[in-house]
């Protein structure tokens, strides 16, 4: 079979070279529609000379060529001739790691304070040692690596009598230099004539107990039987002496010592490659990872870290799912002369660990990353998008753009972290952290799917309809199609307005006095009747119908010290059962949804019926209960004493939901809110039943599936595993972390989900800048979300953990809420069922004001960032100027549009161009064909 593959590969190469790259036909698997082969460039063909064809996709569109010696490969799109290589073509010093398909990092388990990490790469530590094996498997190919040099044991004496050592070894070595190789590694222990009570005698005996029977030489403890020092000694003994294995056995037996072989770091693993009609899947099978777990722990395995990497001559960017999405422009790294890196775990903080990181950053909620690059010679733009399809809860994503003089490439990759490691500082007076490692490692598969992104001219030339353009928009299209193929997404029902979600608080425990006696009461913040009043006012006065209410703290004790929802008791002070039933009836009659909100992830009250911390609470590695520790921005730390709940193990969700359902199902609810299940994911290191985050993800999916079979489910954040079950996602990320390493935020999440999921952005009445938040809602296509209560809200400032809700008064916010809602709705209300089809950043010119001109300040007038252009599917688009301090002029479809600072325009193409200004009281000007149009607030003008 291999011979046939080699012949076919050679034939294809000959036909390409002598046929001037003329096209010919490659049959598909079913031979129904042959694929036209496009030429592969000379440079790519040269790199593929040592590779053989191993796999072809069922539709004949993709091929995988592989180098049997290294495991490196070329991933080919047949119709376009595009090739993605597993490793880049680099030269120079210290470049061997770039030739690796795997980077494996590990720590030694010996010594509490051993925190150093060693990294092996598959090129130096496997292929260069001849330790790569390629095997054919069903529908794929498996590449097996042995990372680390297999030990060779050298049999040299460990303890030997002085006379034997001198007679058999030292006296036989005639060259002084060679003799010193031996003598410097052995110490003489002779206690003859020494006082047994002397310190010298005791020291000798402690170091070498055998010396009490006579003088002996002992090998230095630093020399392991597999080390280079042992190799050098063995070489001298072989050259000059007759010291044999039998002599070695005699000495070890006489002196009762064992020839201990030093621990050698050797790791075995495999990558499995498969092709389907959409592209390449690469899997690290958990069963393939083998090593000495008593001696080492694996901290990270980077899978194809330099796949399709760009060199420093290419322009482009790397994409990571930081919040809404972020890109790192290669040019920014080069301009700054730095290495720009964005890296994070999937799904945010794991509170089961003592050391918490990433508190002020947005979460990586979708397991997607990618890279786009321009060919330095042809200008063709190509790249890839990668989706972690298995094991992502144990993974992280990295984008790294090397702009330093020594840097070689720009790349993006996924990493598996099979063990959870944690650090504790035992000495509070000094920084001596110890490392603890979870006993249980992830043993499932870690799989990444790579989908090619193609140059648009190549797509058109090949007549392809099932491939994706090389941009972050193409990445979003590919991921959306992937979710659609899985049945995760479905079209929204027809909506003509954006949703308005109001999360309202029920009650809070309050210290009061009755007849001078101190009592604790349930202080109402919003009653069931108040919810009806809020809906009625919004409906009657503002004409807003698409309203839903999230009821937080209406049961089980309110919003502080709330009991876990393993039981259910509606608060009497809010109207009790009868008030709730009236609200449910009212909601049904007026066709709006109510979502009672329950926290399944954390418990605020140990005295919850049906809940036992002993059986249901999650444990940290040191066996303490997992707590949700709050971040203190003043100290930039987390505190164990500053926690707001104990984490419940995900393994108990299903059991505890069953208890809630017995009572919840008695009411005519159509929906339920479990906000924290969409945003949090913790491990559980309980000794009796430990679970990693991948296990917790599975348990969360199971309970969400049950909930979704009975109710519409609302979650917060929208971690990817909730997408099949969540009807509504609030606080969907609409911005990135705005890290210094990032070049731009992009609405990747919005592009994927718009038209398929009902979603809102951040809480608008607590946003740092409402205008900015509104623009982000328009750019991402999300609805409005407010946290508001109806009465007694001034008391919230008296509570440390509730003082953040300083602006939740419904009456105070009513007019501004209606204004904000109408602004977003006027812009995108009619677009709820269409896709976001394109997004880009426009170049513009800074508008220098008269005051700035008079000040004589020299301004950079060219602006090439913070001007976003987003297009929706029905010929509607927006240009948004996110610059805070100045307006900009942009050219668009023959128009010169002047947009003030932190403002935007809406453009509709419908038998002409219509420009609208729905962004407040600032004026928009448009110049076209010598005519200037001024567009006031709320106005729409036809330009042509």
Over which residues does each language-model region extend?
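Bacterial N-terminal signal peptides that target proteins for export
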Residues: 1-11
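Hydrophobic core
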Residues: 12-20
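Sec-dependent signal peptide cleavage junction
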Residues: 20-33
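Carbohydrate-recognition beta-sandwich/jelly-roll modules
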Residues: 34-38, 54-542, 546, 901-906, ...
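Conserved, mostly hydrophobic/aromatic
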Residues: 61, 284, 538, 587, ...
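Active-site-proximal substrate-binding groove within the catalytic cores of carbohydrate-active enzymes
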Residues: 64-78, 84, 366, 371-424, ...
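Loop/turn elements at helix/coil->beta-strand transitions in domains of secreted/extracellular proteins
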Residues: 488-489, 495, 542-548, 589-593, ...
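Aromatic-lined carbohydrate-binding/catalytic grooves of carbohydrate-active enzymes
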Residues: 497-655
